Amino acid sequence: MDIYVVGPFGHAMDLLPNPTRPFSGRLHELSALALQRPQLVITTLGALLLAAFYLLPSKDPYNLKRIPMVSRSRVLDAYRSGVWWRFILPRFYPYIHEGYLKYSTKDRPFRVWLAQFQIWVYILPLKYLPLVKNQGITELSLRDFIDKATSAQLSSGSFDTFEVQVGSKLLNGNLIDIKPIVQTRTEQILERVIGRPREWRRFNIRALSVQVVKHVSARIAFGEALADNPGFLDAMERYSLNVIPYTLVFRYFNLGPLRYPLLYLIHLRQRQTLAVATRYVTDLIAERQRKEKEHRLDGDERPVDCIQWSMDQDIPDEQKAPEAVAHRLLHISAALIDAPITSMMNVLADIISYARDEVLDDLRAEIVECLAEFDGAWTEASMAKMKKLDSFFQESFRMTSGLIPLTGWRLIKADCFRFDNDLVLPRGSTIVFPTQCIQLDPNIYPNPDKFDYLRFYRMKEHTQSTDARTGKEVPRHEWLSFGHGRQACPGRFYSIRLLKTILGEMMLRYDIRYAGGDRPRPPMIDLEPILAPDTSVELEFRVRQNVT
């Protein structure tokens, strides 16, 4: 007796064949089953495809894979650039520009893999800029992106709103008090570092920028005593200038679960540097607190610096603990010192390259005229009248948009964020706008590759830029390099005034040129996601004849 079951096509299948059956009979049935096997395979594949059709969309509910991707081949980039090491570190900006032309100009987003942060970044078209402008940190957060990108918890602790308050409220709210200090410190450091050489004297562009910005910004952030303390200055400089290098180290490679343990070990030296700098700050805070109890810091005697402003804030006592204040101020020292250094290098290169002959004479004449109205002081009022100098700076930032050619970085904090019916991104997504591409778009800025120092001078303040492709008004974004909207760089007003004072004084005091003879403006170095100025550039300074 044989036992049968009905097969998938209605045929009987012999599960327990009777061993007494003739061998030829069993062979005949096996042959019949083999003929049915293609039908069985086709049916199985059809069922799997049908299941995949229904199940796969649930893994991509926001249709992220439908957002076009711009890929970067290491081999192809090494071939295109003609530089072998691009196989290891492929360029970033050319591919952002490729995506901008292909998608952004058609109001479509695209995505690119950011190897330094091991994340997909969604590059948004300009039409979404007004929507992002006024979003709060509970929806779209710059602060949380910075915290995640820099791995701040590995060195000095996570960022919070205090750092933003220091820039947006304390620095900006005290600009009138800050300006005289900035001017005095600038004059001191120029005399100390450059002096008044009658013959050409050589300086490295980065070393000079570090010395000048450090001397001025350290005074604003940490007070006169610490700004003139060599031990503190050394620790503060090492900490603030290493934030970005420590942020990027090892991030380019996917190390899996070993990534954070290795980063923690690498940040050990940074934590040690932070501890040294912190001791100086906490000792100063303790001294000031003691004087306050003795009523010796009243009225005009109160120091003008970020330490004192932080101590005076109406915040919980635990947030005003000396170590907490020190850590937060050292956090923002990277923004107050490192960021202006990069900007100073870029603008200084533009001054040497483009502010020549009559252009330089025109800028100098305007500065002299405006300062003369205010007894030689770089005040808010005198700087407001320097329209041509302001236009030169705006054009410089248009051509070289700071350290990163992208702006408006946000981490989506809500469960999801709906930009419109075509674009919804989930929590944890990173968005950004292609600043450099926007500012070099010929449909927005005519002749974008030409440095026109009067470009913004000719623009009326009430007019909007117009996109030549669509005829639509484009949101004003002359300073887009500093971000946009509520979460733009809170220290941008301070930074712009700082740079104008330093570089304006340099133009009045010195003739400046590239060492070794005339040359084109040094190109930027593409180090994903950074466009860095060439730190090897050498300059030469000579005091002007009319400077006494």
UniProtKB/Swiss-Prot annotation:
Gene3D superfamilies: Cytochrome P450. PANTHER family: CYTOCHROME P450. It is found in: Membrane. Belongs to the cytochrome P450 family. It is an enzyme of class 1 (oxidoreductase). Cytochrome P450 monooxygenase; part of the gene cluster that mediates the biosynthesis of aspergiltriene A, aspergildienes A-D and aspergilols A-D. The bifunctional terpene synthase AuAS converts DMAPP and IPP into sesterterpenes. The C-terminal prenyltransferase (PT) domain of AuAS catalyzes formation of GFPP, whereas the N-terminal terpene cyclase (TC) domain catalyzes the cyclization of GFPP into 5 distinct sesterterpenes: aspergiltriene A, aspergildiene A, aspergildiene B, aspergildiene C and aspergildiene D. The chain crosses the membrane at residues 38-58. It comes from Aspergillus ustus. Aspergilol A shows a weak cytotoxicity toward MCF-7, MDA-MB231, and HepG2 cancer cells lines, with an IC(50) value ranging from 21.21 to 48.76 uM; whereas aspergilol B only shows a weak cytotoxicity against MCF-7 cells, with an IC(50) value of 27.41 uM. None of the aspergilols have antifungal or antibacterial activities. One of its GO terms (cellular component) is membrane. CDD domains: CYP503A1-like. GO terms for molecular function: heme binding; iron ion binding; monooxygenase activity; oxidoreductase activity, acting on paired donors, with incorporation or reduction of molecular oxygen. InterPro entries: Cyt_P450, Cyt_P450_E_grp-IV, Cyt_P450_sf. Pathway: Secondary metabolite biosynthesis; terpenoid biosynthesis. Its cofactor is heme. This is Aspergilol synthase AuAP450. It is a single-pass membrane protein. Its EC number is 1.-.-.-. Pfam families: p450. Keywords: Heme, Iron, Membrane, Metal-binding, Monooxygenase, Oxidoreductase, Transmembrane, Transmembrane helix. One of its GO terms (biological process) is terpenoid biosynthetic process. Heme binds at C489.
